[in-house]
Amino acid sequence: MSADDLILHYFEDIKEGQSASLAKTISESDIYLFAGLSMDTNPAHVNEDYAQTTVFKTRIAHGMLSAGFISAVLGTRLPGPGAIYVNQSLKFKAPVRIGDTVTATVTVTGLVPEKKFVTFRTTCTVAGKVVIEGEATVMVPARG
């Protein structure tokens, strides 16, 4: 992603119902890189032999890897650069596997003008199925 891909929405420009999305296909490398960065080396993510003994029968991506795509949308698309996370709730609904394409979407659900806060419904889907849902509050830059 380059600087040309960044989209900035000032608080005054944001309206309820606005939404933005990003999609990423999960690779084996993504899982190993995330495991290294997060120090979460749970074998359900990094060891296929172990993962085959789990309810999922194969390795699954870290939930927070997919949740990170929500942060990417908020920081690069809506509201965009300068947005600061205040709060995020997440509910993990289904696993994400290697090869799945995760689409993270944020939709404006409320505005708090005195604090320049925006609330969002946040979701991640795979093939139209919700795998993560939640709500975020973000502080957004104002024009003035």
Curated annotation (Swiss-Prot):
Alphabetized GO MF terms: (3R)-hydroxyacyl-[acyl-carrier-protein] dehydratase activity; hydro-lyase activity
Lipid metabolism in keyword set: yes
Domain (MaoC-like) ranges: 13-128
Q: Which domain of life is it from?
A: Bacteria
Instruction: Tell me which EC number(s) this protein carries.
Output: 4.2.1.119
Q: Which CDD domains match?
A: R_hydratase (cd03449)
The answer, when asked if Lyase is one of the entry's keywords, is yes
What UniProt keywords are attached to this protein's entry?
Fatty acid metabolism, Lipid metabolism, Lyase
Catalytic function, reaction form: a (3R)-3-hydroxyacyl-CoA = a (2E)-enoyl-CoA + H2O
Give the record's GO biological process terms. Answer: fatty acid biosynthetic process; poly(3-hydroxyalkanoate) biosynthetic process; protein homotetramerization
Annotated function: Catalyzes the hydration of trans-2-enoyl-CoAs with a chain-length of 4-6 carbon atoms, forming the corresponding (3R)-3-hydroxyacyl-CoAs, which can then be utilized for the production of polyhydroxyalkanoates (PHA) polymers. Cannot use trans-2,3-octenoyl-CoA as substrate.
What do we know about how this protein assembles, alone or with others? Homotetramer.
Q: What PANTHER family does its record include?
A: HYDROXYACYL-THIOESTER DEHYDRATASE TYPE 2, MITOCHONDRIAL, HYDROXYACYL-THIOESTER DEHYDRATASE TYPE 2, MITOCHONDRIAL-RELATED
Q: What is this protein called?
A: (R)-specific enoyl-CoA hydratase
The protein's organism comes out as Rhodospirillum rubrum (strain ATCC 11170 / ATH 1.1.1 / DSM 467 / LMG 4362 / NCIMB 8255 / S1)
